[in-house]
Regions:
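Positively charged n-region of N-terminal signal peptides that target proteins for export
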Residues: 1-5
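Bacterial N-terminal signal peptides
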Residues: 7-15
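Boundary at the C-terminal end of the N-terminal hydrophobic targeting segment
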Residues: 18-20
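Flexible, low-complexity segments enriched for small/polar residues
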Residues: 22-37, 45-48, 65-68, 295, ...
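Alpha-helix C-capping/helix-to-loop hinge sites
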Residues: 28-31, 122-123, 141, 145, ...
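N-terminal accessory alpha/beta regions
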Residues: 34-141, 145-156, 162-164
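Active-site substrate-binding loop specific to GH73 endo-beta-N-acetylglucosaminidase modules
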Residues: 115, 151-372
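Amphipathic alpha-helical interaction segments
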Residues: 127, 131, 145-149, 185, ...
Length: 488
């Protein structure tokens, strides 16, 4: 399908070619649904400025509301899990050690599964699709590995309170929310960072991956100074505030699991990226966040990442420069930066050409085939993501999953997608079976009869291949395996 270069007035969707609106929706959402391929004139504006109501169907709302992570605060959950760990440790070396560890591991696994379920249900059914795509993008940008320590007890809250609310807001607020979240602090070992025993791990990743990027002009001395600024920022899983002396008691901060312990902080003055920062405690961290979020290098690096995710693997210097300028003029307003991206000819020309990573492939396939039915079991999707090498919340290193086609277009990946396409196209009844449930579902829709298929400009070779399928399930599989469906 040849995509024309779009006029700059991209927001006037009525002026686009008939097929461009579905392509736009396909790029900025987790995929079109079978009978919802079109886009209204105001759709993009609504996506850039969504309201609080995600418009989830009642069945999805009920599933999310029933989760422990939706009913209990993270602090209560994480402290309870920590107690299970302490009980398991107390039994170490005894005959009951193995059994004593099971409740701890089961609790962590269940909490991770709950977080994954809530995230996928929103991806599948929220009307605010751009926000949900950005929630995945920003989680990947500020990545934490769920299976490290007690992070499985925190990862749902990390996505829900640190990432999602700021996905289309100011970058400074997003950065701050991640800096002060216990999941990030524990993941990058900042609870081990103390005056006289500096741990540079988190400071280095903030500068290298979260803000300025490698080779952007900061020095090793800047990393060391930021590490000093971050001393004392930690996590308290006991539920009991620390005892500190009266002379520093006012400096101590305890907020849920977050803790700033002045006894561990380096109160010496610092020079960070050319800025003098007076030793003052937690305020130093806020000052550093202000400095980092307003660096031209941060604007350029993060704009490049956004362009790679939403446009193309190698965005032009001109596009990145335009986005960077908007960033600096708007003080890091993410929606404004995205507006500049979406209004560009380069973005319009890229529609339909961006290769889907595993998350986009799996979620878009389920949305297309079952977009009008609320699934009862997300485990099959999680299994598919694992098989394709992109488990949800499962990237071990802080760099996050790659965003480029080369990482995901290998022959092994494509073969796995064919197998998954066969399962989804044949009905995937396991999606609609909760634990212990034997209910069956009607067969999937015949995709070739949907509005989506009718609007799709498939090459003749692809249409001919699809018609070779002997059954609707076979034809669904062939569509979901087609080169066109592999792209967005």
């Amino acid at each position: 399908m040849k995509i024309p270069v779009l006029a700059p007035a991209l927001f006037a969707l009525a002026t686009l070619p008939a097929f461009a609106a579905p392509d736009l929706v396909n790029r900025l959402s987790w995929g079109v649904t079978a009978n919802g391929a079109g886009a209204e004139r105001a759709w993009l504006e609504q996506q850039l400025h969504p309201g609080d109501d995600d418009g989830l169907p009642p069945q999805a709302v009920d599933q999310i509301a029933a989760l422990d992570i939706s009913r209990k605060p993270m602090t209560e959950i994480a402290i309870a899990v920590k107690q299970l760990q302490l009980q398991a440790r107390a039994a170490k070396g005894t005959d009951g050690a193995k059994d004593a560890r099971k409740p701890y591991q089961q609790a962590l696994n269940d909490l991770e599964r709950q977080a994954q379920t809530r995230s996928l249900l929103r991806d599948l059914y929220s009307r605010n699709q751009l926000k949900e795509q950005l929630t995945w993008f920003w989680f990947n940008h500020f990545n934490v590995f769920a299976k490290k320590g007690e992070i499985r007890a925190m990862v749902g809250d990390y996505e829900e309170t640190a990432i999602r609310p700021h996905a289309l807001g100011k970058f400074r607020d997003l950065l701050a929310a991640t800096v002060f979240h216990p999941a990030m602090i524990q993941y990058l070992d900042n609870q081990q960072n103390a005056a006289g025993k500096i741990n540079e791990n988190y400071a280095r990743e903030i500068m290298e991956l979260h803000t300025m990027g490698v080779g952007s002009g900061y020095s090793q001395a800047d990393v060391q100074e930021l590490a000093r600024i971050l001393t004392g920022v930690g996590v308290n899983l006991t539920g009991i505030p620390r005892r500190v002396g009266p002379q520093i008691r006012e400096q101590y901060v305890s907020d849920g699991l977050f803790e700033f312990n002045p006894r561990r902080h380096d109160y010496g003055d610092k020079t960070f990226l050319g800025h003098a920062i007076k030793g003052s405690g937690l305020q130093e961290v806020s000052d550093a966040i202000d400095i980092l979020s307003r660096q031209p290098a941060t604007a350029r690096f993060v704009s490049t990442q956004l362009a790679q995710y939403f446009c193309c693997d190698a965005p032009s210097p001109a596009l990145v420069a335009a986005m960077t300028a908007t960033w600096q003029h708007s003080d890091g307003d993410i929606a404004a930066v995205l507006r500049t991206l979406f209004d560009s000819n380069e973005f319009g020309a890229s529609l339909g050409h961006k290769f889907k990573d595993p998350m986009h492939y799996a979620v878009s396939a389920v949305r297309l085939v079952y977009g009008d039915q609320v699934i009862a079991n997300t485990q099959p999707i999680l299994n598919w993501l694992n098989r394709m090498g992109e488990p949800l919340f499962g990237h071990e290193t802080p760099d996050g999953y790659p965003l480029t086609e080369a990482a995901w277009a290998g022959p092994g990946q494509i073969a796995t997608r064919f197998e998954i396409a066969r399962q989804i196209g044949a009905g995937a009844p396991q999606l609609f079976r909760a634990d212990g449930d034997t209910v069956t579902r009607p067969p999937p829709p015949v995709l070739e009869q949907t509005a989506w298929y009718q609007a799709l400009q498939l090459p003749t070779a692809t249409r001919d291949a699809v018609t070779q399928g002997a059954t609707p399930a076979d034809r669904n599989m062939l569509l979901l395996s087609s080169p066109q469906f592999m792209r967005r």
